[in-house]
Swiss-Prot record:
Residues 259-291 are annotated as: Disordered. One of its GO terms (cellular component) is cytoplasm. Binds 1 [4Fe-4S] cluster per subunit. The cluster is chelated by three Cys residues, the fourth Fe has a free coordination site that may bind a sulfur atom transferred from the persulfide of IscS. It catalyses: cytidine(32) in tRNA + S-sulfanyl-L-cysteinyl-[cysteine desulfurase] + AH2 + ATP = 2-thiocytidine(32) in tRNA + L-cysteinyl-[cysteine desulfurase] + A + AMP + diphosphate + H(+). Catalyzes the ATP-dependent 2-thiolation of cytidine in position 32 of tRNA, to form 2-thiocytidine (s(2)C32). The sulfur atoms are provided by the cysteine/cysteine desulfurase (IscS) system. It is an enzyme of class 2 (transferase). The lineage of its organism: Bacteria, Pseudomonadati, Myxococcota, Myxococcia, Myxococcales. InterPro entries: Rossmann-like_a/b/a_fold, TilS/TtcA_N, tRNA_Cyd_32_2_STrfase, tRNA_thiolation_TtcA_Ctu1. It is found in: Cytoplasm. Its EC number is 2.8.1.-. This is tRNA-cytidine(32) 2-sulfurtransferase.
Amino acid sequence: MQQIHRLERKLLRATAEAIRDFDLVSQGDRIMVAVSGGKDSYTLLHLLMRLRERAPIDFDLVAVNLDQGQPGFPAQVVEDHLRSVGVPYRMLQRDTYSVVRRLVPEGKTTCPVCSRLRRGVLYNAAVEMGCTKIALGHHRDDLVETLLLSALYSGALKSMPPKLRSRDGRNVVVRPLCYAAEEDVAAFAEAMRFPIVPCDLCGSQPNLRRKRVKRLLAELSAEHPAVKGNLLHALAHVVPSHLLDRDLHRQLADATGRDPWLDAEDEEAEDCGEPSAGDGVVSLGGARGGR
């Protein structure tokens, strides 16, 4: 029980800080919490329910689970949990599984197509239900893994934003767990004995690139525990004058009337690839950056 309280406090602090930093929840919001049956979404729902009890503003939560027609999906397990915690909920059924199997060649990962179809269903449901925001359970590790995936395999410096508006302009998506470490989320979900639904019911091949990046981060973290926290910190501390983005450079030059590259400090002599004296666990606001 003591472990549960310790983990809950830690996760509540990280979630509350993200909500404050990025204005993720507003007075009168009706927030759809997408609950897949995994550790992340169960934890997100629990934390938002706890924060709602003590928040200085009023907002509503409604949990939504989508049965995509995957063989053996235990929708009743998820529904029983939602009923037991006393949150308003809605169970959706859309056979996107057969669409995915038709579109994706055998042996290829179905996750990207499946995710897009699922997101579309949730977007439409949110509008129908009058929800002002959709909360997803992506955590810190998802953000830093996506940062490396984008840089290494797509040649772009980008990750998952804490808040975004959908392309059609109808929905706002928020990620309140963006400061929370996956290991804390996993430990909390296990301690709470959430009824976890396996994520491989579809039989899809795993995303090998993401698995490789996750392995790389684990190896680096074993040598330097602050690696993941530092990567998250980097997402919030961009130094445009030390990047090669000409469009960004032009925007800054137009806004300031100065050439950002000529204003850049010469740090090359210090950059030997080794930790500096100040290296270690950094924080993003008040959230710890190490674990």
